[in-house]
């Protein structure tokens, strides 16, 4: 496998995302973490902030690049000359949604393959939305996100509570 693309919003990146990035980077020559620009969705972090945070937590992985994209993933794939999409799966509902997306992407470009990677069981409950919710109510996010970005989240949420 040469170049693979791992797309998502990553608002913010979680330890589950990072686990998929680490594992996927071992099975391809280059992994592009593709951060989706969705002007209709107001995220906690801007696209530039998300890209910077992901770069910060993946800097040890020399074959990982972080870029943003808008529009169809298939167009981004063509631009990057990649034929492989990496998707992490936590639950059966993730599979149902991602399976439909994989079929659509393959319909748009039959040369595109989607590789599903099972999330490590210890992260199967984890989502960016749940991280934001826990942080907004003052809960501890230390086990949910990479340590390097905890200050970014606290600053955005404007919450000073420390983990016990």
Swiss-Prot record:
Q: Which cofactor does it need?
A: Mg(2+)
Which InterPro entries does the record cross-reference, listed alphabetically? Answer: Cyt_trans-like (IPR004821), PPAT (IPR001980), Rossmann-like_a/b/a_fold (IPR014729)
Keywords of the record:
ATP-binding, Coenzyme A biosynthesis, Cytoplasm, Magnesium, Nucleotide-binding, Nucleotidyltransferase, Transferase
Q: What class of enzyme is it?
A: transferase
Q: What is its EC number?
A: 2.7.7.3
The record's section on Pfam families has: CTP_transf_like
For this chain, one GO molecular function annotation is:
pantetheine-phosphate adenylyltransferase activity
Origin superkingdom: Bacteria
Q: Which SUPFAM superfamilies does this one have?
A: Nucleotidylyl transferase
SUBUNIT field? Homohexamer.
PANTHER family reported for this sequence: PHOSPHOPANTETHEINE ADENYLYLTRANSFERASE
Describe the family membership recorded for this protein in Swiss-Prot or TrEMBL: Belongs to the bacterial CoaD family.
Q: Know the name of this protein?
A: Phosphopantetheine adenylyltransferase
Source organism per UniProt: Clostridium botulinum (strain Hall / ATCC 3502 / NCTC 13319 / Type A)
């Amino acid at each position: 496998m040469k170049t693979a693309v791992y797309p998502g919003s990553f608002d913010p990146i979680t330890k589950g995302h990072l686990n998929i990035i680490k594992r996927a980077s071992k099975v391809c020559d280059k992994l592009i973490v593709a951060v989706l620009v969705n002007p209709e969705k107001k995220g906690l972090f801007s696209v530039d902030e998300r890209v910077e945070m992901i770069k910060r937590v993946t800097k040890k992985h020399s074959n990982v690049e972080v870029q943003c994209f808008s529009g169809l993933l298939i167009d981004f794939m063509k631009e990057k000359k990649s034929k492989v999409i990496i998707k992490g799966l936590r639950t059966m509902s993730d599979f149902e949604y991602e399976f439909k997306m994989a079929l659509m992407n393959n319909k748009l470009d039959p040369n595109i393959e989607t590789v599903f990677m099972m999330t490590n069981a210890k992260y199967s409950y984890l989502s960016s939305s749940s991280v934001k919710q826990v942080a907004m109510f003052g809960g501890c996010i230390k086990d949910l996100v990479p340590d390097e970005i905890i200050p970014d989240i606290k600053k955005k949420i404007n919450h000073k509570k420390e983990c016990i």
